[in-house]
Design a protein with these regions (language model features):
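Non-catalytic signal-transmission and effector/linker regions of two-component phosphorelay proteins
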Residues: 1-21, 124-139
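Conserved acidic carboxylate
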Residues: 26
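Charged docking surfaces used in two-component/phosphorelay signaling
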Residues: 33-41
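Short hydrophobic/Thr-rich beta-strand motif most characteristic of the beta2 strand and flanking loop
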Residues: 43-50, 58
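Active-site beta3 strand of CheY-like receiver
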Residues: 62-68
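Active-site residues of response regulator receiver
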Residues: 70, 100
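Receiver (REC) domain active-site loop signature in two-component systems and cognate sites
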Residues: 73
Length: 139
């Protein structure tokens, strides 16, 4: 690798380090990929998990600035994941956005102190970006 390539690679690494990091948790592969690309285009670095258990491990191992999670997943629901994060000293202040389908509107209407925001699927890129920006200003 020549000096120009090294400089570009190092600049990319430094830029990624300055981006806020979102832990994305979604069991549907195509939805996860769509959300991952959407978040990256909004300027976020993304760590993706396919279920709540994987997300727990990633949250403990990586510094994260926000969590975007599906409500219904195998092994651990989005709300169970949120409660786990709120009970962890290091992670309790991380904003959590719960994504829910139309069929699960009850989850969004029930009071839950562990969730900062609810968005309905299919979520629009601008809606997600605006929600995360608002939560980051609050914290």
């Amino acid at each position: 690798m020549d000096n120009d390539e090294t400089t570009l690679t190092n600049a990319g690494i430094a830029n990624a380090a300055n981006q806020p990091c979102v832990l994305l948790v979604e069991d549907d592969r195509s939805a996860r990929r769509f959300l991952e690309v959407t978040l990256q285009r909004c300027g976020y670095r993304v760590i993706a998990a396919a279920d709540g258990l994987e997300a727990m491990k990633l949250a403990l191992a990586s510094p994260i600035d926000a969590v975007v999670t599906d409500a219904i997943m195998p092994h651990l629901s989005g709300q169970q994941l949120a409660r786990f994060l709120r009970n962890n000293e290091k992670l309790r202040r991380v904003p959590i956005v719960l994504l829910t389908g139309q069929e699960n509107r009850d989850a969004a209407s029930s009071p839950d102190d562990s969730i900062d925001a609810f968005l309905y699927k299919p979520v629009k890129a601008e809606e997600l970006k605006s929600c995360l920006a608002g939560l980051s200003r609050r914290n």
